[in-house]
Amino acid sequence: MASNKTTLQKMGKKQNGKSKKVEEAEPEEFVVEKVLDRRVVNGKVEYFLKWKGFTDADNTWEPEENLDCPELIEDFLNSQKAGKEKDGTKRKSLSDSESDDSKSKKKRDAADKPRGFARGLDPERIIGATDSSGELMFLMKWKDSDEADLVLAKEANMKCPQIVIAFYEERLTWHSCPEDEAQ
């Protein structure tokens, strides 16, 4: 993506001197109006963007490396910092120390991140199973994701029974009795 200023200049040139066909020949250049949100997916930062001249229904998540609008990203990050500082001052009066606040923030971030089926991804296969928490859980690999999550077996049984069956079938072993072989 081109920077906000660069893209606007290019668009101006297109409108002043070149035909509409040239505009259509470069459909990959769009102008970012505003950065709305930020997330990390598979270790890569993505931004939720409002595109200039498009409706909110056309907003998209784009990887940071595809973007060249540092001013808009900086504005967004500064607004996020300002919002967190306001919240932080309220929490500081309630918490005993800075270190406690940063530890609880990390826990909140981890707790806020959707896990399992809440991520809205389709299950690909079950990698393993455990009952270390007292309940049977499956380690689920998701389609189009490198991350795996522990999900309750009860939930997997309801939401993806064929994947659960495939997991058990892979581990099924048959033992024949000597009497059966004689017949």
Curated annotation (Swiss-Prot):
Component of heterochromatin. Recognizes and binds histone H3 tails methylated at 'Lys-9', leading to epigenetic repression. Probably involved in the repression of many genes located in euchromatin, such as E2F1, MYC and CDC25A. Involved in the formation of functional kinetochore through interaction with MIS12 complex proteins. InterPro entries: CBX3_chromo_domain, Chromo-like_dom_sf, Chromo/chromo_shadow_dom, Chromo_dom_subgr, Chromo_domain, Chromo_shadow_dom, Chromodomain_CS, Heterochromatin_chromo-domain. Keywords: Acetylation, Biological rhythms, Chromatin regulator, Isopeptide bond, Nucleus, Phosphoprotein, Repeat, Repressor, Transcription, Transcription regulation, Ubl conjugation. This is Chromobox protein homolog 3. Disulfide bonds: none annotated. Residues 1-28, 78-125 are annotated as: Disordered. It comes from Mus musculus. One of its GO terms (biological process) is negative regulation of DNA-templated transcription. Residues 82-125 have a biased composition (Basic and acidic residues). The modification Phosphoserine is found at S93, S95, S97, S99, S176. It is found in: Nucleus. Binds directly to CHAF1A. Interacts with histone H3 methylated at 'Lys-9'. Part of the E2F6.com-1 complex in G0 phase composed of E2F6, MGA, MAX, TFDP1, CBX3, BAT8, EUHMTASE1, RING1, RNF2, MBLR, L3MBTL2 and YAF2. Interacts with INCENP, TRIM28/TIF1B and SP100. Interacts with TIF1/TIF1A. Interacts with MIS12 and DSN1. Can interact directly with CBX5 via the chromoshadow domain. Interacts with KMT5B and KMT5C. Interacts with POGZ. Interacts with CHAMP1. The modification N-acetylalanine is found at A2. One of its GO terms (cellular component) is chromatin. Coiled coil: none annotated. SMART domains: CHROMO, ChSh. The modification N6-acetyllysine is found at K5, K10, K44, K50. Gene3D superfamilies: 2.40.50.40. There is a cross-link at K5, K10, K21, K103, K154 (Glycyl lysine isopeptide (Lys-Gly) (interchain with G-Cter in SUMO2)). Residues 30-88, 121-179 form the Chromo domain. Phosphorylated by PIM1. Phosphorylated during interphase and possibly hyper-phosphorylated during mitosis.
